[in-house]
């Protein structure tokens, strides 16, 4: 079953799914903007296209992740994203 999600007045859209190869996950697109996300459980984020400028919990410096790069976010935390161009991603819920 696919689940459509929309955040930040439609600036972030994703489709949630479950598969044997990725487990529970979502794939989505973000347009230009700054976003604050909260996690309920640990997440693994893979940038598919574009780039994300990320401030992870406990971090003091932003880090850019390009297409093909992966970062992890702890559960029960918040992380900040700056998006300069439309960017697609895969989020796996660990």
From Swiss-Prot:
Keyword field: Glycosyltransferase, Transferase
Pfam families in the cross-refs: Ppnp
Gene3D superfamilies hit by this protein: Jelly Rolls
Enzyme class, spelled out: transferase
Catalysed reaction equations from the record: a purine D-ribonucleoside + phosphate = a purine nucleobase + alpha-D-ribose 1-phosphate; adenosine + phosphate = alpha-D-ribose 1-phosphate + adenine; cytidine + phosphate = cytosine + alpha-D-ribose 1-phosphate; guanosine + phosphate = alpha-D-ribose 1-phosphate + guanine
One GO MF term attached to the UniProt entry: uridine phosphorylase activity
One GO cellular component, as annotated: cytosol
EC code: 2.4.2.1, 2.4.2.2
Domain of life: Bacteria
Family assignment from sequence similarity: Belongs to the nucleoside phosphorylase PpnP family.
Function (record text): Catalyzes the phosphorolysis of diverse nucleosides, yielding D-ribose 1-phosphate and the respective free bases. Can use uridine, adenosine, guanosine, cytidine, thymidine, inosine and xanthosine as substrates. Also catalyzes the reverse reactions.
NCBIfam families on file: PRK10579.1 (NF007875)
Protein name (Swiss-Prot/TrEMBL): Pyrimidine/purine nucleoside phosphorylase
Organism, scientific name: Escherichia fergusonii (strain ATCC 35469 / DSM 13698 / CCUG 18766 / IAM 14443 / JCM 21226 / LMG 7866 / NBRC 102419 / NCTC 12128 / CDC 0568-73)
């Amino acid at each position: 079953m696919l689940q459509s999600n929309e955040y930040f007045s439609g600036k972030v859209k994703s489709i949630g799914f479950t598969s044997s190869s990725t487990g529970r996950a979502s794939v989505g697109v973000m347009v230009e903007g700054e976003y604050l996300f909260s996690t309920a459980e640990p997440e693994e984020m893979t940038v598919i296209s574009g780039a994300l400028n990320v401030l992870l919990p406990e971090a003091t410096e932003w880090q850019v992740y390009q297409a093909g790069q992966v970062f992890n976010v702890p559960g029960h935390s918040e992380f900040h994203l700056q998006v300069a161009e439309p960017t697609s991603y895969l989020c796996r819920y660990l």
